[in-house]
């Protein structure tokens, strides 16, 4: 079992508090002036990736104290527990073993004394056989035409992870093969997705462990109806629908061949499941060999995380620096800013991974947490964000620690595009750190012929105070291995934060209440009766909806 220690009561936390009082006003620019080797000392290399944490409001003592906190709260022991299959998801009585899905070593991974690896390898082989047929063009539909479009129907982890990876690794896709993702129960999502598709060349992947997930099965039923309107014969469903599920009876009742049912396990959380059969859409789209490379990248980072001392452990360092900002500087948000269009869904993916994992207010003792937990995670690809919210990053009243991610080599070299992109990335990180003081702004404005009252009036608006922290992750190219390593790095960062904060990171009870209430409201929408069973606001909203719908229907 994980330690159950209130971190705020530890000696290391208290020492960090005293240390914060002494360093909170330190200027990062001064730290660089004092230490010409700061970048060299505070950047970490891993495979084809460098993680630079030098632009943070930290000193060597800060890092030492943060590592003391990690040790005192049992981070190293928690890492070992996860890898050996202990039931660290205590509220659900489950192991947490997404690392087993990408375990490429010839070593067992045990749950209750049973090795899960034969089952993992069995599903991977099933995925290999099926995805190879799709990727190679051998998989045909009822009219013997090659499959050209894959539609993945899922929600949450069954959607965000595969969608993010498929988008990021699109350069590895087979020409003529397209992938689409449907998650929202809003009918517009599936209707717009299916427009222009041909039932005879479309493959549907239904991702629902229980095959009862309301949003997913509603969309699946609509997809089946659309398909049959074109195909006619219900017998053709088996050639065009596959399931990622463990409910064989429901899968077969839907019309899916049991041989096309891909299983996974309760020790895989949804937001950590892209490495499992949930990644089937990715394997079909980019080919199984490239999917295996994704697993290899994750596995390599797992080995680093499991075996590297805390001080040099990239996920641990990132986690502890984040805790420094969340709990001592009281910075409530973090921005994820990928300077690679392929990573356009990465901020949303991390938003779920972080906020669903660590957005908790009850600690492992069952008490209310007295300290902040998960930051709000958000972001957009550069340079789009620069023309949207970077104004706040540079001059707003809230300081937002940022993660910049940028490749050295683009998959789509085009003139000066990539060099301009990279220049913007590095410039933004530098500007956040250095800012621009009054003297520099005055010189610049004077050189442009501005002086006197106008200069004095505009000067305060053009000053950037700087000292705003960021990490920069530079990688050679967005390959499957690099992406796998980056995803695993952030997964482990999130895990370490949850351990230190004394919360359970692998449940999501906060999702359940809204789902239960929706099940109560849904039948109340079917008639014209006035609803009085909820609070005044909810009753009012339901009844307004009914009135509006009724008027629309009559018109």
From Swiss-Prot:
Catalyzes the reversible isomerization of glucose-6-phosphate to fructose-6-phosphate. The gene is pgi. Its main location: cytoplasm. GO terms for cellular component: cytosol. InterPro entries: G6P_Isomerase (IPR001672), G6P_Isomerase_C (IPR023096), Phosphoglucose_isomerase_CS (IPR018189), SIS_dom_sf (IPR046348), SIS_PGI_1 (IPR035476), SIS_PGI_2 (IPR035482). This is Glucose-6-phosphate isomerase. Belongs to the GPI family. PANTHER family: GLUCOSE-6-PHOSPHATE ISOMERASE. It catalyses: alpha-D-glucose 6-phosphate = beta-D-fructose 6-phosphate. It comes from the Bacteria. One of its GO terms (molecular function) is monosaccharide binding.
